[in-house]
Amino acid sequence: MLFPEDQVAFCERCFHSTPCWCCHLPCGPLHRRLSDERIVCQHCYSTALLSPSQLGPLYEGTIRFFQNQMKMRLKNRPRLKVTDQRYLLREFEITDHTFGLYTNSLEEETIFIITGIAEDRAWITLAHELTHFWQKRNCPNPQALVLVEGFAEWTVYKLAEHHGLERAMLSMRRNVAEPYHTELHALLGLEQKLGVQGVVHLARTKAGLN
């Protein structure tokens, strides 16, 4: 059984094995069960980030990307907290496949990241949630949800492009979930006409694309 776009192949037995929670490909006979019962494949586990000290350099790298490549300045930053899925399910009633979450309370703002996700997934999760932090300070309120989420996904795509995360870019292009899919492709099209800073300016000034 072939997954040509992912450049991997599986025998029939492995093809029908448990899918990896992180990449969704079959785990095969080798897999790891995390503390909160999620099952991940050996490939994802080999780059899994399990502690704040491992995620810290990626967080700093994401902030540098925002400021240097995207010109999206951050005067301050939210707290970064690594937790397991059970905590987010209990405290925030997230969906089963949420990799991260940005929360805004009167006391503090926090980006939660699920422990045990692969490095490329951690990059894009950090970028998506950090975009929401930036949007709160720089974009119209209210702003259409499709533009809020579409711009966050577009920013993630630019980070993946910058770091050469080809599989992440492919996954985003073929993701049909809304409100991410349509607006991501719309903003990629607008980028060809307006450039990167033109899209950032649109997000800063418009309540929606219509």
For each feature predicted by the language model, list its residue ranges.
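Hydrophobic (often cysteine-bearing) scaffold residues that line and stabilize catalytic clefts
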Residues: 55-58, 123, 127, 144, ...
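Active-site recognition of the HExxH zinc-binding catalytic motif
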Residues: 66, 124-137, 149-153
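Preference for well-ordered, secondary-structure-rich cores of eukaryotic proteins
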Residues: 113, 135, 194-195
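Post-HExxH zinc-binding segment in Zn-dependent metallohydrolases
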Residues: 138-181
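Short pre-active-site segment immediately N-terminal to the catalytic Zn-binding motif
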Residues: 106-126, 139-144
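Auxiliary, metal-adjacent structural segments of Zn-dependent hydrolase domains
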Residues: 49-109
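N-terminal low-structure segments adjacent to metalloprotease catalytic domains
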Residues: 1-60, 64, 68
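Pan-zinc metallopeptidase signature
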Residues: 12-25, 29-32, 36, 177-210
